[in-house]
Regions:
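Acidic, metal-coordinating helix/loop segments flanking the phosphotransfer/catalytic sites
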Residues: 33-52
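Alpha4 helix (beta4-alpha4-beta5 surface) of REC/receiver domains from two-component response regulators
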Residues: 66, 87-102
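The feature encodes the CheY-like receiver
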Residues: 57-60, 88
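Two-component/phosphorelay signaling modules centered on CheY-like receiver
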Residues: 14-32, 98
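Short amphipathic alpha-helix used as the core "switch/output" element in two-component signaling
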Residues: 65-76
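C-terminal output helix
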Residues: 90, 108-118, 125
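Acidic catalytic/metal-coordinating carboxylates
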Residues: 35-36, 63-66
Length: 127
């Protein structure tokens, strides 16, 4: 597996983190899991050799959008997919306006998620 196939998942719900991690492992990806934006930012190696981030918008503490804004200031930010149970259209459009690959509503359609990840990683994009 290429190192760019490591995916970071940031979600405050343990079941979501583990479910996504299991799904991605079964498709050949490695994962790093964080329960908050603060936890990710406090780990100096969190984004080392990462191909993609999946970030929940509604994190406790720092929101997913706040985390993305901080990460965007760093060089070499990998592609980001936002996820949320929020049904507001404005949330979707804000995620896209910030520069995310896309926004997926929970519960997440796993086929859509895997297709997006495969497409993005095959393009080797770094934002």
């Amino acid at each position: 597996m290429a190192l760019s196939e490591r995916i970071v998942i940031v979600d405050d719900e343990r079941a979501v983190r583990s479910g996504l991690s299991n799904l991605l492992h079964s498709d050949g990806y490695s994962t790093r899991l964080f329960e908050s934006g603060e936890a990710l930012l406090s780990d100096d190696d969190a984004l080392s050799e990462v191909g993609m981030l999946i970030i929940d918008v509604g994190l406790k503490g720092m929101s997913g959008f706040e985390l993305f804004t901080i990460l965007k200031q760093r060089a070499g930010l990998p592609p980001v997919i936002f996820i949320s149970a929020d049904l507001e259209e404005t949330t979707l459009w804000y995620a896209i306006a910030l520069g995310a690959v896309t926004f997926l509503r929970k519960p997440i359609d796993v086929d859509t998620l895997l297709t997006l990840i495969r497409c993005e990683l095959s393009q080797g994009k770094v934002r």
